[in-house]
């Protein structure tokens, strides 16, 4: 089944809000055996919406709309779709009662225009909205399926999961299963080269690579008859990709690198402390975003100035004078200092130049040193990164997590 997602709202066209609904729906539909072929966005204009809808119905089996179901005059999605599909709008009393109860629960008076939301296309499947006022619906017409969902993500997501996904799972003869492998330390073009023969030979399963913030994800997707397992066609391909990616593969369950590291730390009861300069606490933030990390994360220090490095971490003044704050030597003493101060199994350090200023010919913007100190010794790694300040900080954090991962798993560390 081929689907098009049609987002309705002038605010989307103006760039005032991001179209996160389409991304979310696209990520979930494959598990119900539905492939997304197109994304479209149209403003709150009934004529242009009608044009987009007719095109979508011509080229796809399924059209899923988001937005335009509210009580105001510019909320015209339901009216436009009903007209195109030849359906009358009729009052659905249960939906009207739900809307009244919603306002009552908030202690507010329902204005008359809200009644508009309870008028539904005749013969449609009603999708109850337990998080707002506008119900959604599904129309089956002429061998096509049109799904209307509210625009606010807090209303759309539960409605989509509770009603739409089960609906399509019951409809389709096929289901789609995917495995997502995540790799760090190999660029997208190099990764694609490693598996090009697999990509060229793909039929079922299919293989796709995509890059994001210094890492590469590889999606392996299989289509099987509903009720059958995809393991027999997925596992051989996944295992071959794992073999070719080697130590650079850090997850076969679509987990982030920081989540994988947090799991390794807690599973092995390895305590950790961080000393950060140019990343400004980013590594600590990413760790503390993960539930349960408190049992191993003892604390972090943002030692931005030379004085803080000396006074809090015990970095020698002579080290900074001789080698500079951005150096292997300083990174080494920072990692050792935080480990000793917090009495942890691992001490992590970062010192570098994130830009846009501060660089020299000898030490340019993007030069970063990271360090890891443990009972077995201290290692440091030099990074030469490019991009803006945010990107340099983000890629640095990923390199730190990869360093921790490799240390715990006793993998090779390229210094």
UniProtKB/Swiss-Prot annotation:
Organism the protein comes from: Ruminiclostridium cellulolyticum (strain ATCC 35319 / DSM 5812 / JCM 6584 / H10)
Matching Pfam families: CinA, CinA_KH, MoCF_biosynth
Protein family: Belongs to the CinA family.
PANTHER family the UniProt entry points to: NICOTINAMIDE-NUCLEOTIDE AMIDOHYDROLASE PNCC, NMN AMIDOHYDROLASE-LIKE PROTEIN YFAY
Highest taxon of the lineage: Bacteria
Protein name: Putative competence-damage inducible protein
NCBIfam families: cinA_nterm, molyb_syn, PncC_domain, PRK00549.1
InterPro entries (UniProt xref): CinA (IPR050101), CinA-like_C (IPR036653), CinA_C (IPR008136), CinA_KH (IPR041424), Competence-induced_CinA (IPR008135), MoaB/Mog-like_dom_sf (IPR036425), MoaB/Mog_dom (IPR001453)
Classification via SMART domains: MoCF_biosynth (SM00852)
